[in-house]
Swiss-Prot record:
It comes from Saccharomyces cerevisiae (strain ATCC 204508 / S288c). A divalent metal cation 1 binds at residues 61, 89-90, 159. It comes from the Eukaryota. Present with 1500 molecules/cell in log phase SD medium. GO terms for biological process: deoxyribonucleoside monophosphate catabolic process. A divalent metal cation 2 binds at residues 93, 98-99. This is 5'-deoxynucleotidase YGK1. Belongs to the HDDC2 family. The gene is YGK1.
Amino acid sequence: MTAVNIWKPEDNIPREILAILSKPHPNYQLAFLNIIQLLKTQRRTGWVDHGIDPCESISDHMYRMGLTTMLITDKNVDRNKCIRIALVHDFAESLVGDITPNDPMTKEEKHRREFETVKYLCESIIRPCSESASREILDDWLAYEKQTCLEGRYVKDIDKYEMLVQCFEYEQKYNGKKDLKQFLGAINDIKTDEVKKWTQSLLEDRQAFFDSLKE
């Protein structure tokens, strides 16, 4: 009977980082930062698949999301929590990769891999540095993943909004010749009133741009 290979985060850590972790007294801070560095070099799959070269990295996306959350004016929102959630919401992709709906993987398996990665990073690499950081990062990631708080919902919307902004930037860069309309489907997933307003303003600017190409 053939054994089933189950994906595990620890099996996907680069050799040079494993070398750090295998030392008698591992430098866990360095190992963690080296893993996060992978987000700076991994390109966002959706743009790669549409021939955008060069395109943004996962880290680029999360950084601008974090800054965007600072623009929230809703007084009921803890913006500092939003910033934290934005910074960690995709950090499992450092080992899992940027999986899209076009990839041959179920949503359940994608979630399992990401959750296992977050647990592994928090328990095995971050906790030896800081127990409080380990708990906070896991809690913030779950707040986004499970949408358990207002801040998680705002960051979910800003995830979509930032992608739409990036889409428009690439449409402008390629003078409207790249067909990126499929990314506009994210508009319907935005729930909060404030981010809806941002999106409507963005769409008006986008329409004006495409109208100008017809002149």
